[in-house]
């Protein structure tokens, strides 16, 4: 977003920050009444703020009369962070929580883009390929753990386990191909509205792959997969939570409606 909407100085600063090893994030979710831009700066807090008090800079959204305004906010103050509500089965290491933004400055240096840029299409919806790629990494990690178990145990010689692993492998590889094409389409200079439909459908493909692979691991490994000292247990708990992205059913419905209204592969001679 800084590369898309940032000023020359903001992009230069981003390069220096990344070179220095700083960590950046994006925080949009918020408890009522939400974050606003006031005369004295930001007012309000963000929830589900990944790395609250630990990362360096967060791109946050704040309401204005003209729409959501992105602001670059200092995110490393532990006194502003409250992780106490992050009582979840997985992804505990993300140290997510609420982060009080009240009083942080909104000026030319911190204001990112114009109001409305955060939700500007097709970048907003098509940008979902990024979290799908992260999900895919979790899917492939679980698949690797399952593969290692089967390769090192007699279970790997059983046709039923090999068949189950084969289906899981096919699901994960299919998800990879969808994510790769979604990224290519979304990042193309001429990306249009049709890209959104493809990315929305990709979300469901990756979610299905994740559920398939986790179920395959649980069935093939059995009770041992659920012991807390088994790496698969944490991998599945983390993935199960990260698969829960917003409105998955609506995303599938939007994609299906778009594909029914117009051939989504008109540019593909093999379709």
Report each predicted region and the residues it spans.
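Buried hydrophobic positions in well-ordered alpha/beta secondary-structure cores of metabolic enzymes
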Residues: 7, 42-44, 101, 139, ...
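C-terminal helix-coil-helix/basic helical segment that borders enzyme active sites and/or dimer interfaces
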Residues: 151, 174-205, 215-226
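Glycine-rich beta->alpha junctions and the first turn(s) of the following alpha-helix
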Residues: 88-173
């Amino acid at each position: 977003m800084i590369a898309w909407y940032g000023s020359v100085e903001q992009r230069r600063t981003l390069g220096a920050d990344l070179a220095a090893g700083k960590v950046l994030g994006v925080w949009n979710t918020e408890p009522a009444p939400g974050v606003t831009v006031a005369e004295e700066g930001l007012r309000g807090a963000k929830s589900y703020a990944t790395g609250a008090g630990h990362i360096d800079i967060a791109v946050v959204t704040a309401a204005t009369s003209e729409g959501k305004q992105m602001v670059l906010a200092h995110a490393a103050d532990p006194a502003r962070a409250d992780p106490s509500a992050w009582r979840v089965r997985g992804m505990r290491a993300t140290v997510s929580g609420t982060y009080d933004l009240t009083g942080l400055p909104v000026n030319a240096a911190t204001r990112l883009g114009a109001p409305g840029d955060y939700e500007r299409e097709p970048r907003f919806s098509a940008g979902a390929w990024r979290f799908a790629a992260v999900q895919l990494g979790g899917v492939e990690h679980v698949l690797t753990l399952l593969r290692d178990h089967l390769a090192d145990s007699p279970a790997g010689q059983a046709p039923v386990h090999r068949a189950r692993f084969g289906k899981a492998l096919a699901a994960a590889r299919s998800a990879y191909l969808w994510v790769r094409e979604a990224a290519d389409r979304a990042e193309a200079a001429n990306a249009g509205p049709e890209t959104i439909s493809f990315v929305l459908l990709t979300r469901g493909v990756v979610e299905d792959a994740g559920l398939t692979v986790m179920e395959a691991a649980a069935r093939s490994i059995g009770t041992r997969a659920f012991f807390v000292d088994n790496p698969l247990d944490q991998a599945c708990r983390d993935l199960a939570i990260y698969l829960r992205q917003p409105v998955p059913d609506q995303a599938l419905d939007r994609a299906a409606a778009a594909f029914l209204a117009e051939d989504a592969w008109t540019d593909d001679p093999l379709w």
